[in-house]
């Protein structure tokens, strides 16, 4: 494992176009906002990184103005957005309604377990969670806008297991994981001792590493 100590601007420069980027936070708690801000600045300046497939487990709207996922409110920056809610993502709403990219919502618990599934190399999550809700493929399949309904990359499938209907949420690779910690040592071990919450930091980092991706920690 290669460990590098770099600044947020350098971290943003390492993200290729078309990457799948997973971001861990809960509203503004444990939010690596310096990195997200530098991603925005680089996109405004250079037009890169573009066409990112962005995943966040919980809502990361930050302050409801400029922080969190609001940094990504630029046409062309995202090509797909998978989340569990859009709490305080006020700048993102217009892009969703304008169909700037497909937006999908699936249950927060499923996305949380998905990080562990990806980390352990499982094919995905099989569960009844989401059945008979708008997440069910027989209803809306978690589609939030028309762009999502027209997209072939659906986050959930209806399957049968032992004669019963279930939902299958397929796993995916993570190219970049962005998390926040309190301290780091020279070996890359991260402490969360001053963070407000223990979220999916470990699972998301492991998922990215086992996908051959990069873990960025602010």
Which residue stretches match the model-derived regions?
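Conserved alpha/beta enzyme-core scaffold
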Residues: 1-218
């Amino acid at each position: 494992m290669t460990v590098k100590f770099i600044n947020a601007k350098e971290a943003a420069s390492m993200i290729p176009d078309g990457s799948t980027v997973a971001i861990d936070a809960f509203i503004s708690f444990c939010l690596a906002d310096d990195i997200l801000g530098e991603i925005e600045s680089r996109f405004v300046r250079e037009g890169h990184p573009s066409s990112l497939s962005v995943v966040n487990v919980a809502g990361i709207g930050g302050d409801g103005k400029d922080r969190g996922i609001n940094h990504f409110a630029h046409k062309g920056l995202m090509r797909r957005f998978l989340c569990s809610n859009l709490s305080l993502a006020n700048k993102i709403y217009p892009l969703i309604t304008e169909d700037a990219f497909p937006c999908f919502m699936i249950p927060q618990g499923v996305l949380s377990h998905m990080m562990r599934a990806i980390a352990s190399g499982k094919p995905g999550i099989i569960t009844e969670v989401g059945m008979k809700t708008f997440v069910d493929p027989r209803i809306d399949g978690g589609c939030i806008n028309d762009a999502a309904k027209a997209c072939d990359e659906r986050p959930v499938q209806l399957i049968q297991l032992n004669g019963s209907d279930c939902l299958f949420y397929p796993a995916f690779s993570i190219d970049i994981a962005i998390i926040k910690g309190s301290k780091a040592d020279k070996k890359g071990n991260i402490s969360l001792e001053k963070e407000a919450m223990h979220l999916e930091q470990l699972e998301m980092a492991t998922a990215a590493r086992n996908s051959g991706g990069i873990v960025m920690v602010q």
